[in-house]
Amino acid sequence: MKAIKIAIDGPASSGKSTVAKIIAKNLGYTYLDTGAMYRSATYIALTHGYTGKEVALILEELEKNPISFKKAKDGSQLVFLGDEDVTLAIRQNDVTNNVSWVSALPEIREELVHQQRRIAQAGGIIMDGRDIGTVVLPDAELKIFLVASVEERAERRYKENLEKGIESDFETLKEEIAARDYKDSHRKVSPLKSAEDALIFDTTGVSIDGVVQFIQEKAEKIVDMS
């Protein structure tokens, strides 16, 4: 049976990662968290106090401490920078609020996209992000673009933060998500937009199971036809 490439794009907190992880597990595919890669680069920038003018130093740190993914005993995915487990650190609010400017740096995107394409070559992979279907995997057999209202996405982020013990204010989250949407869709390099051949799916009011079922059925149909 042919293993395909699945690209899931969408704005912040549209459910991309949650859905992608479940589908990868169900299909026996590899899940590549591209957002975690950009968050890791952002974590490096913030930890060392680097600005957008010091891209070479961020890349140097990435080379010294490469991004890798490992599985925890419970099956969840851990993110490492070199030997440092940054799984929780890269989800903190300061990283979330700065990832847009770091991910907009052309040199950072070029390096991480190169890594992502190399990993995806063999197929049997599902990636989520903001430019997977348009830039990273334009040849993906299935492209999905998830959308949801700012209100619903802020509520999801608020619940996620509660579960992780991160303090947050709902109204502030709404403002931050709206600002992130604007930054991501207006950046010069790889702006957030759906691929022309992507299936657009509004997840507002739709359960995770409902979104998973929709995408998985599309994937299985493509596999059956190939």
Curated annotation (Swiss-Prot):
Keywords: ATP-binding, Cytoplasm, Kinase, Nucleotide-binding, Transferase. Signal peptide: none annotated. GO terms for molecular function: ATP binding; CMP kinase activity; dCMP kinase activity. One of its GO terms (cellular component) is cytosol. The keyword tRNA processing does not apply. Its EC number is 2.7.4.25. It catalyses: CMP + ATP = CDP + ADP; dCMP + ATP = dCDP + ADP. It is an enzyme of class 2 (transferase). GO terms for biological process: nucleobase-containing small molecule interconversion; pyrimidine nucleotide metabolic process. It is found in: Cytoplasm. ATP binds at G10, P11, A12, S13, S14, G15, K16, S17, T18. InterPro entries: Cytidylate_kin (IPR003136), Cytidylate_kinase_dom (IPR011994), P-loop_NTPase (IPR027417). It holds the Pfam family Cytidylate_kin. Belongs to the cytidylate kinase family. Type 1 subfamily. This is Cytidylate kinase. The lineage of its organism: Bacteria, Bacillati, Bacillota, Bacilli, Lactobacillales. The gene is cmk.
